[in-house]
């Protein structure tokens, strides 16, 4: 971790319109679709802004009514959009069908030729963006979208490092997006080597780096050690674990590694589940908030992140619309199941 410094959090990534059938209807049954907006990094920004953290999201939006509606959506949470690239292209869409019982959730993307995919290196004044920043967060979705978006992401990470920001990455592997030529392993290995904080799950670690996270907390501990050997710049590694009992009943927990400590969190039973989209982003936001707020108390930061993301499963939409007080109440109620430093 970099020395503590005041400043905003900057996030970078595509924002899309989400369209969902009401309730748990299938897309083929729907005669209307519920509309909201979301994107991994923007979801992080919106949660942090609600918790009083100064935050700016950098993205590209089409200069039309859909792009402006997307911007209004983010601004309502207090997210700064001072360096949005407005231009042509389109707003990406995704269709989310909520599952039930043994029918899993499904996602259908319609994001080709979006304004974000058309971003070109040199199009964002990163020195200006980072002038009053302390933290930069990105995810593996951004370089997956297109070759030019990947190069823009690389440019952003290097610019953040040059001015001493803490840089965090959520692997966020999306196999259907990596179709522009280079492999996710090749691109992400270079970018992750520049980061301070890495967030992932067993599936993304296997897909991107070919790593087997094994089972439970001890599996997380072992794979965290291997990641630390591969990427010596990493100072913190968080790994989430989701257990799926049915489409409506999951379990959720995480671990946190640092060079001289390993921390585990309680396991949360998520039942019933309203909406799982954005739960990983809620974890990331909770972790960033905790690391900025609780000093060296890594255990508390991890438990805050897991509690925040468990609450997200009860909130419709991509954004975790809960307060710090609500998160802390959930943490308190789970004191009988607390994690520990290993």
Residue ranges of each PLM-predicted region?
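Short beta-strand/loop segments at the ligand-binding rim of alpha/beta enzyme cores
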Residues: 164-171, 177
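Glycine-rich phosphate/adenosyl-contacting loop at the front of the ribokinase-like
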Residues: 1-80, 100-102, 106, 119-122, ...
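A short helix->loop->beta-strand "cap" motif at the edges of active sites that frequently abuts
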Residues: 159-166, 231-235
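Conserved post-catalytic alpha-helical subdomain immediately downstream of the catalytic base
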Residues: 263-333, 338, 342
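Hydrophobic faces of well-ordered beta-strands that scaffold small-molecule active sites
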Residues: 57, 167-169, 198
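Conserved phosphate/ATP/ADP-binding segment of small-molecule kinases
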Residues: 177-260
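Acidic-glycine-rich active-site phosphate/pyrophosphate-binding loop
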Residues: 11-25, 249-266
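Conserved N-terminal subdomain of the carbohydrate kinase-like
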Residues: 54-143, 327-334, 342
